[in-house]
């Protein structure tokens, strides 16, 4: 499943976001964040189940603080749902898979 995850940085973010026409879940996380690690498998499952229509990207906020600031990330995990380079929705904290799926379905 690892090949379906984009690991974005401040230098690669805009270019990579521009390449994706499908819905992109962008997970702002940190290594030390237990809730971030808890929701990661759920995000990976959703991306795998929706392959072709949804992709998963991860941004480590410790390594990319300017990118986190640019999107107003104050709590992690924060998942941005982006389409055509625009933020369409977001989720803060850990939420059930069903809630994430509803948000993805609304953007499809």
Where is each model-derived feature located?
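Proteins that catalyze or organize thiol-disulfide redox chemistry
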Residues: 1-26, 30-55, 63-78, 82-108
